[in-house]
Amino acid sequence: MTYLKLTGSRQGLISAKCSTSESIGNRFQTGHEDEIQELTLNHNISRSQNLSHHPVQFIKPIDMSSPLLGVSISSNEQLEAIFTCYRTNQNGRLELYYKLKLTKASIVDISSTYTNVTNSNGIIPHEKILLNYESISWEHITAGTSGYSIMENNIF
């Protein structure tokens, strides 16, 4: 399971109450009420000569943050995004094991898909969001490793 805590410079905690039954119905998760559930999270950094940071892409269910994300892209709001990844540990419980943090991020693309519930083969209404950012950090919590990259510092 992956979750997102998203805070905007103007709107505050955009992810507030996003994982409640009012927001996402029976998909809600106790203990993660103020986070956005992620269906997928993708990120790419490449290098030919200089390092190239590509937008972070995530897919999420349509929830109560969806209108706020529209406001955010419209106003070019500066965001802080913290993605947390959970896995099942040896005792059968979920444990936080990985964290990805974006600072000075902004939404560059929103693409929404509204499926027909009666014939969608389990696909729920969702949206794909792309975020540009100034810096990114990674932390493998259980293994004790971490790293970061700042876009401006990567021209060689």
Description of each model-found segment:
Residues 1-156:
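Glycine-rich, low-complexity intrinsically disordered segments
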